[in-house]
Amino acid sequence: MANIKSAQKRILVINKKTARNRMIKSQLKTAIRRFEESLAAGNFEEAKTRLKLVEKKLHQAAAKGTIHKAKASRKVSRLATKLNKAI
């Protein structure tokens, strides 16, 4: 544990940010999993709507600094390619 007051405050801030990032990444994984499940089931209309949701969540996570913006774009591109190949 830190002894300096400012370092103790930073530990609290880091814990909050870590919890937020963990929550956002979990939501991303869930959204991607649901998209892939609907794609595997052959429900393409639902997959299209879920892809829009995944894209939105990925770009929001990139805007908040949870993931890099290039990673978000790459994931969106790969998921869209996966959808287009399935259709």
Curated annotation (Swiss-Prot):
SUPFAM superfamilies: Ribosomal protein S20. Disulfide bonds: none annotated. Pfam families: Ribosomal_S20p (PF01649). One of its GO terms (molecular function) is structural constituent of ribosome. Signal peptide: none annotated. It comes from the Bacteria. One of its GO terms (biological process) is translation. Keywords: Ribonucleoprotein, Ribosomal protein, RNA-binding, rRNA-binding. Binds directly to 16S ribosomal RNA. Belongs to the bacterial ribosomal protein bS20 family. This is Small ribosomal subunit protein bS20.
